[in-house]
Design a protein with these regions (language model features):
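Short, acidic/polar
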Residues: 41-55, 113-130, 174-180
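N-terminal binding-site loop/beta-alpha segment at the start of enzyme catalytic domains
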Residues: 1-89
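Surface-exposed, active-site-proximal loop segments in enzymatic domains
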Residues: 100-113
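Beta/alpha (TIM)-barrel catalytic core signal, keyed to glycine-rich beta->alpha loops juxtaposed to Asp/Glu
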Residues: 3, 143-328
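Acidic (Asp/Glu)-rich catalytic clusters
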Residues: 16, 80-87, 128-131, 160, ...
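Alpha-helix N-cap and loop-to-helix initiation/capping positions
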Residues: 39-47, 73, 77, 110-118, ...
Length: 338
């Protein structure tokens, strides 16, 4: 299969590791399903398994998940998808967001901790759910509580020394926070949100990572499905109650109309190359030299087909300029005060 060969050969070294990863990886947030604080609505596990296996068959060689996705369910689905596969992908997961009966019935289901014992317990639980002996990349999900990040990072460094994880990284950290923990142990990678609608990391964080050989695997390059080309106002209106996007400003007016207008520009640019709007959105993030690879979610095999081409697609300079012009001419609208 030619596309599998093409995707597989476009690998990049992740930071200070020996891992050569494909330009896009499979993001497993949505396959955690609904019925939790940051859920995406109901999800068929068979569709999830098919999506993962199809992505791997097409050459994607890494999966990013987290213990908290679906309150452990995402990791279990990943394990199911990998059963019996001879060639296993790299598996990345994350810690720091935990749940228990104490918090289950409260409005905020998730409790955050970077205490030594908590991190160790999370790792053991992730290894069990993923059915793995070692995690390829173990990441702190959020720098919260901030006064515990040193203790959490020291614990990850110790787990690496013990051989339970191969490399360690962080997600959603600022430059100042990375400076603090880098005195304890080197950072292999940062996982920040980055898309044409969320560019806050461009000024300081991405240049810092590039300067310090910290790999960058950005999440939400398609803004949680908004830039895929499949999103409409009608579809947004029909989001289930347990889909976190219902309450996100980018999926509400006045931003929604502006964002869907951007999608039409991406559709126009992509059509000249046989690419989807989502592939254009992903390729735009990969154009930044500080970005190693992008995390891309899919909930079924068909969605994988709509994003796989981003691994090799490169935007022309004039196309990048058209996107920049649109974003400049159409700033984020502010909802009028009542």
């Amino acid at each position: 299969m030619q596309i599998a060969e093409t995707v597989q050969t476009t690998t990049r070294q992740l930071g200070n590791s020996d891992m050569q990863i494909t330009a896009i990886g499979f993001g497993a947030w949505a396959i955690g399903g609904g019925d939790w604080q940051f859920g995406w609505g109901s999800q068929d596990d068979n569709d999830s398994v098919a999506a993962i296996q199809h992505a791997l068959d097409l050459g994607i060689n890494w999966i990013d998940t987290a213990a908290v996705y679906g309150l452990g369910h995402s990791e279990e689905v990943v394990a199911r998808a990998l059963e019996g596969r001879q060639q296993k992908p790299y598996v990345f997961t994350k810690c720091s967001m935990i749940w228990s009966k104490k918090f289950w019935q409260t409005k905020d289901q998730i409790h955050r901790s970077l205490k030594r014992d908590s991190v160790r317990n999370e790792l053991e639980s992730s290894l069990r759910r993923l059915k793995l002996d070692v995690i390829d990349l173990y990441q702190i999900h959020w720098p919260d509580p901030e006064d515990e990040i040193e203790e959490g990072w020291e614990t990850l460094a110790k787990l690496k020394q013990e051989g339970k994880v191969r490399y360690i990284g962080v997600s959603n950290f600022s430059v100042a926070q990375m400076e603090r923990i880098s005195k304890i142990a080197p950072i292999t990678s940062l996982q920040p949100p980055y898309s044409m609608l969320n560019r806050g990391v461009e000024k300081e964080i991405l240049p810092y990572c590039q300067q310090h050989n910290i790999g960058v695997i950005n999440y939400s390059p398609m803004v949680s499905g908004l830039l895929t080309g499949a999103m409409t106002k009608e579809r947004v209106a029909q989001f289930p109650q347990d889909d976190w996007r219902r309450n996100n400003a980018r999926f509400q007016e006045p931003q929604l109309s502006r964002n869907l207008k951007l999608v039409e520009l991406l559709r126009e640019i992509g059509s000249a190359h046989g690419r989807s709007p989502g592939e254009v959105a992903i390729a735009w993030t990969l154009n930044n030299p500080a970005v190693t690879a992008a995390i891309v979610g899919a909930r079924n095999a068909k969605q994988v087909d709509g994003i796989i081409g981003a691994a090799t697609f490169r935007l022309q300079l004039d196309e990048i300029a058209r996107i920049e012009d649109f974003l400049t001419a159409n700033p984020v609208p502010v909802k009028p005060s009542k």
